[in-house]
A protein has these predicted regions:
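Active-site Gly/Thr loop motif
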Residues: 213-231
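Oxidoreductase and adenylate-handling cofactor-binding alpha/beta cores
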Residues: 140, 168-188, 205-212, 256-268
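Glycine-rich beta-alpha junction loops
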Residues: 40, 121-124, 195-200, 238-240, ...
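Terminal low-complexity tails and localization/encapsulation signals of metabolic enzymes
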Residues: 1-9, 235-237, 274, 308, ...
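Mid-domain beta-loop-alpha active-site segment that forms a flexible
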Residues: 159-176, 195-205, 247, 251
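Aromatic-enriched alpha-helical interface/lid elements that frame and gate functional surfaces
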Residues: 230-313, 317
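Conserved Rossmann-fold dehydrogenase catalytic segment
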Residues: 152-161, 183-199, 221-224
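N-terminal helix-loop segment corresponding to the beta1-alpha1 unit
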Residues: 1-184, 304, 308, 373, ...
Length: 413
């Protein structure tokens, strides 16, 4: 963890992916992020996959470096404590609905310069999740083999909840923008970030929306080919699949040389009356002929030999790996400074943990911090932020309004 945000405290009341991601990124830059959950855990506390000890690996990784407070959020007193924590701290990240007890108006009534950041489904208040937003975005119907029939082929969903992670990152940025504004003007802000707007807005920002409207039709499916440029997966003689991309003149020249295709490319150019060195357009328009030529050349090489040739020519390429292979690849994990030693994870399972994605040369990134046990910091936070005595906290524990650490609670997967 860096300490760039060490003077910032944020209350997080959230679940699933986008909202915890926003808090995680702030925490990895040094912010004190206090996640408040119901005493039995939030909706994501038992998110699959669970270890034999009943601990969620998803929850454990999305909540690293945070503090945990457990309140009875179904009771009036528990909700009041949560509101008081948010107002006292001044910053809130949540995905609870605006009509909930954490409505911005209620918080602003207690603190005029309150900043609340709320992740929503759709801009009109309808519920949504990454998977349903993705369905509406158009992307699943761009994916799939190019020979699929456009009228009958199924959509292809992506495994990665990309809209959740993009939304979480955008929310961390929006929170810091609101803080910067408050620092200059003294004004708080209500910030709403609909997941659906992130998806359709990304479609627009990428130029894809303008493209569809200009065409008056949908983009064709391309299989694993790169849209608008030269790139696709190929297979070596020994059966290794790898991806190549050539978007610059240097990348294109290097790829042609590495594959030994100078003469073949020259012959194809003469046949078609084009120059592939002129840019993306001729390479993309004649991709089928180029793909056949490159695959024929790949059939003559084992992957190790071809990879050495591509590396020598400065090509952009990578071998396909399974996720398990990626997790065990030294270049990606063990020898990568992004990862640090396993902290004391609540699950008891030791595995590499990430530092901040942003690397600040000259600054100590520190070792990754563990996720908390549920309620691990309840007592400390209530005492520090709200000034409650140990006796008052004890009475709240006895009443079931708050809960302390579940470290020694028996859980079943």
């Amino acid at each position: 963890m860096y300490n760039l945000l060490s003077d910032l405290s944020i209350i997080e009341v959230s679940s699933f992916v986008a909202s915890p991601t926003a808090g995680l990124y702030c925490a990895q830059m040094g912010a004190e992020v206090i996640r408040v959950d119901h005493t039995a855990g939030g909706l994501d506390y038992n998110r699959y996959l669970l270890t034999r000890e009943g601990r969620s690996l998803s929850w454990e990784n999305l909540n690293r470096a945070k503090k945990s407070v457990a309140l009875d959020l179904q009771s009036g007193e528990g909700r009041e404590l949560c509101v008081e924590l948010a107002a006292t701290t001044g910053q809130l990240i949540t995905n609870l609905p605006e009509q909930s007890f954490l409505a911005h108006a209620a918080l602003q009534a207690r603190r005029a310069d309150m900043i609340s950041l709320r992740i929503m489904g759709w801009h009109d208040g309808r519920q949504a999740m990454d998977f349903t937003v993705n369905a509406a975005s158009g992307y699943p119907l761009m994916c799939g083999p190019e020979d699929w029939d456009a009228q009958t082929a199924p959509p292809v969903n992506q495994v990665l909840p990309a809209w959740d992670f993009i939304t979480g990152a955008y929310c961390a940025f929006a929170m810091l923008a609101a803080l910067h504004h408050r620092g200059r003007t003294g004004e708080g802000n209500e910030v709403r970030v609909p997941l659906g707007d992130v998806a359709i807005g990304t479609l627009a920002n990428s130029g894809a929306m303008a493209e569809m409207l200009y065409r008056g039709a949908d983009r064709e499916r391309l299989g694993n080919a790169i849209w608008g440029a030269f790139g696709r997966d190929f297979r070596s003689r020994d059966g290794v699949r790898f991806m190549v991309a050539a978007l610059t003149p240097k990348q294109w020249r290097g790829l042609v040389t590495a594959f030994g295709l100078q003469q073949g490319i020259a012959a194809l150019e003469a046949e078609l009356g084009v120059r592939f060195a002129d840019g993306d357009t001729p390479r993309f328009q004649h991709r089928a002929a180029l793909f056949a030529l490159f695959q024929q050349a790949a059939d003559g090489f084992d992957y190790a030999a071809l990879a050495a040739r591509m590396a020598a020519e400065g090509c952009t390429f990578e071998r396909y790996r399974t996720a398990y292979e990626a997790a065990n690849d030294p270049a990606l994990v063990a020898d990568n400074p992004l990862f640090g030693p396993a902290p004391a994870n609540p699950s008891g399972f030791d595995y590499p943990a990430t530092r901040s994605f942003a690397n600040l040369p000259g600054r100590d990134a520190g070792d990754p911090a563990p996720a908390p046990f549920l309620g691990e910091h309840t007592e400390d936070v209530l005492a520090e932020k709200l000034g409650l005595s140990s006796g008052a906290i004890g009475r709240l524990v006895d009443a079931g309004t708050v809960a302390l650490s579940d470290q020694h609670t028996t859980r079943s997967p």
